[in-house]
Amino acid sequence: SSTVPLMRLGVFVPTLKSTNKAIAKKSNVGSNINASDDLRHLELAKSEGFERITISGPRLDMDTDFKVWTGIISVLTDNELESNEDGTISIRFTEFAMRCGFSRGRLKAEFREKIKDSLRKLMSNVVEFSKDRGTNIEVTKFVQLIGESTVDIGNDKVILTPSKTLKDLYVGEYKILLKLRALKALARKESAQALYTFIEALPPNPIPVSIERFRKRLSLTSRPALQNSTVRKALKQLEDIGYLEYQELKEGNKIAFQIIKRNPSLK
């Protein structure tokens, strides 16, 4: 089952540019979100039978906190990076900032403070798992969004430790981030977006996909020759953003496409 990203749960909200002090103050109060339906597939919830899952803590914004979260996710799910037995990973501060999507020009002292604020807020968010609430066999488990974090300016380092029980949450979030990145790269290219979601859901080493299947997926109404060129153009756009490697196969008047490789990270 696919993971629901934390941002769709409303954990991250747009920054209020309001001059109204009362509203701004209220937005800092924090949030308590019922995520039972969306996070019940997590290993911890399944293995220990937790029925209710909530996320509570300071409200997180899209401007900085969400970007820092994407940086954390990209570090904690990167198998190329060296980690010790509890999953702790050390990375250069400048590289961490780039993984968050911040430009190089932003690495000033004030910006470092912003990243520290975001880490503090993210670590103050707690995922609460509970079962048999209100009975005398009630069990409640509290897990921080991330285990530990260190910002070491002198050594140009950010050190992150995951919460072990949330490993599958990180992996699910990462998949969603890759998807968002691809869809952003395909802005206003609706046919390519639709084929992206279709191709990404295919199993590993898929059998060739007929052009008819692609046409059906796009629900096109134009004449077949035009539909075929729409499909080819969309596949070419997926190739251009670095997502897809494919080959067109022709046999008689049958046309199909062999999916050679998918690169969700658009490398």
Regions found by a protein language model. Give the residues of each.
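Charged, alpha-helix-forming regions
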Residues: 1-267
